[in-house]
Amino acid sequence: MDIFQALFLGLLQGLTEFLPISSSAHLILTPAFFGWEDQGVGFDLSVHVGTLLAVVLYFRRDVFGIARDGLISMGQRKIVGQGALAWYLVIGTIPAGLAGLALLDMIDNELRGASVIFFTTLVFGILLGIADWLPKRQRTMDSLNWKDAVIVGIAQAMALVPGTSRSGVTITAGLFLGMTRETASRFSFLLAIPIIVLASAVKLLEVATSDVIVDWNGFLIGGVTSFLMAITAIHFFLKWLNKVGMWPYVIYRIILAGVIYAVLM
């Protein structure tokens, strides 16, 4: 992997991980479009770590408060502060974790083609637009319950299929449940933390137990660029959220689906 490829893919991962446009679709399609070889599991690990550090740093106060109150709630056997939210994040992670263990090989082998990504990019983009268009979205973080966590968690599991977009489908589910844009987005981003930790652990195990030779230059470039781009993307996404809504991302997904159909199908 040359420096340009590592830089480009790191920036791309950081930009697309938290925007509702699917990072996996972009990381699959871009090498195919440019004729690049697969970036390798070591690079995948680096960009996962970069985006994980970005979301943890950006939401550091939330993360600290949720972790603290979750541990206190466990010790006292009653909900304290944000202890309930800690449990909702655990509940919301379980469906994707189980689906990943059961279906990841099948998804990697059979659901990474252009036709699948075209379908998921288009259909889930339209669903995001419909969810954003619906009125009466007034629910805040304080109103969340375990049923919301289960539904959003199931939606997150669907994002194992490339093109769906983890942030996109979880925000869509939140909006359909009546959450405000900010609530749906913040819950989605917080829910990303445990799932990225799990994904990073899987990649780390794969690196540690195989004969993979890690390109450390690419690893460093990918990790740093994905971190910087991800924290920037989160900031501006939330800053502009109520001004522009989800429609720029919906339109982009429709255009991207058209490009996939025209060029790769």
From Swiss-Prot:
It is a multi-pass membrane protein. One of its GO terms (cellular component) is plasma membrane. GO terms for biological process: cell wall organization; peptidoglycan biosynthetic process; regulation of cell shape; response to antibiotic. InterPro entries: UppP (IPR003824). Its EC number is 3.6.1.27. Keywords: Antibiotic resistance, Cell inner membrane, Cell membrane, Cell shape, Cell wall biogenesis/degradation, Hydrolase, Membrane, Peptidoglycan synthesis, Transmembrane, Transmembrane helix. Signal peptide: none annotated. It is found in: Cell inner membrane. GO terms for molecular function: undecaprenyl-diphosphatase activity. It comes from the Bacteria. The chain crosses the membrane at residues 1-21, 39-59, 84-104, 114-134, 144-164, 187-207, 218-238, 244-264. Its main location: membrane. It catalyses: di-trans,octa-cis-undecaprenyl diphosphate + H2O = di-trans,octa-cis-undecaprenyl phosphate + phosphate + H(+). Pfam families: BacA. Bacitracin is thought to be involved in the inhibition of peptidoglycan synthesis by sequestering undecaprenyl diphosphate, thereby reducing the pool of lipid carrier available. PANTHER family: UNDECAPRENYL-DIPHOSPHATASE. Catalyzes the dephosphorylation of undecaprenyl diphosphate (UPP). Confers resistance to bacitracin. Belongs to the UppP family. This is Undecaprenyl-diphosphatase. It comes from Marinobacter nauticus (strain ATCC 700491 / DSM 11845 / VT8). The lineage of its organism: Bacteria, Pseudomonadati, Pseudomonadota, Gammaproteobacteria, Pseudomonadales. The gene is uppP.
